[in-house]
A protein has these predicted regions:
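Aromatic-lined carbohydrate-binding surfaces of glycoside hydrolases
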Residues: 6, 16-24, 30-183
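Surface-exposed loops/turns
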Residues: 9-13
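Surface-exposed binding patches on compact interaction domains or structured appendages
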Residues: 1-3
Length: 183
């Protein structure tokens, strides 16, 4: 059980005690004793912390857990309390994904690309950063704004996904370093 207690800056040092009531569906409420010791020290504002906290965020997992459409207004509202906890803990970095599944199959919720890549009918490329920009701006608005970690420039299987306007399908290029496609 995780309990978060917000202690006002002007709280007097000492021990505080009380009861914590725990409730759950289909269970009787229980009261538990709780004791908190307030130290004679006030932390500086989170913005001034020099500790570099960099925990990876997975917005795709939040959408799944909350059953909301990915990148919708409901998704951003569902992420707000989760990412605010990170900001309050001193998180400095935004985790952004440039390709699909940058960690291959190593996470339960696959990370998608925040950049849409389109090969146009004339063979030129379009890179749409709308989702990337919205995600980064959202995280910056919460105070997580010191660094953006972008994963990954090179995919595991050297497969680069894109939308092919000529076929109307999602496609990919499989390549190796040094090949014309890679260049």
């Amino acid at each position: 059980v995780w309990v978060t207690v917000s202690v006002p800056e002007d709280a007097k040092p000492g021990k505080y005690s009380g009861k914590l009531t725990v409730t759950a569906a289909n269970a009787k409420a229980r009261s538990l004793p709780i004791e908190i010791r307030v130290a004679d020290h006030v932390l500086p504002p989170v913005r001034d912390w020099t500790f570099h906290l960099d925990l990876w965020q997975n917005p795709y997992a939040v959408a799944r857990l909350e059953s909301v459409p990915l990148w919708s207004e409901e998704h951003f509202e569902a992420m707000r309390p989760v990412m605010s906890l990170l900001a309050d803990a001193g998180q400095k970095s935004v985790t952004a994904t440039l390709i699909n599944r940058p960690w291959n199959g190593q996470t339960y919720d696959a990370f998608g690309s925040m950049v849409t890549k389109v090969r146009r009918i004339d063979g030129t490329w379009l890179f749409d950063y709308t989702i990337f920009d919205r995600w980064v701006e959202f995280m910056f608005s919460l105070g997580i704004d010191r660094q953006i970690n972008c994963y990954s420039m090179i995919p595991w299987a050297m497969e680069f996904d894109f939308y092919n306007q000529a076929t109307g399908l999602n496609d990919c290029v499989r390549t190796v370093a040094g090949s014309p496609e890679y260049e």
